[in-house]
Amino acid sequence: MFSAQHKIHKEKGVELSELDEQVAQAFFDLENTNQELKSELKDLYVNSAVQVDISGGRKAIVVNVPYRLRKAYRKIHVRLVRELEKKFSGKDVILIATRRIVRPPKKGSAAKRPRNRTLTSVHEAILDDVVLPAEIVGKRTRYRLDGTKIMKVFLDPKERNNTEYKVEAFSAVYKKLTGKDVVFEFPITEA
């Protein structure tokens, strides 16, 4: 029968880390034990998993999923993340689609670069993936006197209860993946 190895597809020649094996095993276990996720998880797999340290000794697990399967993952995102967080107790789980950045074409080259492969587009898409149950309702970029930039991202206040405890994890993961500082806030709504 199948094993946990079928739940992770790495690039050729890349060894599986211990965390990759644990995540693949968790997906395999969920597919076999959880009836409501069984049919959806049957055809899904992951590319890799990375552990990110958050302040206060907490950790987050970033699971990279194939770009083609991102819509299928979005349908079951909330339930899947809840189950994975139970399996990896005390760690936040964040699902991100694997995307590639292509360098700008050389001068005189006829080849065009697709918009979704630019650095800006990939970083914005990663930001959307990181905060997924919530939606981004606004962004502000603040330039400090010393030249550093901080991006303020405003999240949908309706999802405050589901995502407020993960805001630190969102910032740490986005900083690790892109190198950019970001602060997440919920705008104040007038009643």
Swiss-Prot record:
One of its GO terms (cellular component) is cytosolic ribosome. GO terms for biological process: translation. One of its GO terms (molecular function) is structural constituent of ribosome. Keywords: Acetylation, Coiled coil, Ribonucleoprotein, Ribosomal protein. Transmembrane segments: none annotated. Residues 15-50 form a coiled coil. The modification N-acetylmethionine is found at M1. It holds the Pfam family Ribosomal_S7e. Belongs to the eukaryotic ribosomal protein eS7 family. This is Small ribosomal subunit protein eS7z. It comes from Arabidopsis thaliana (Mouse-ear cress).
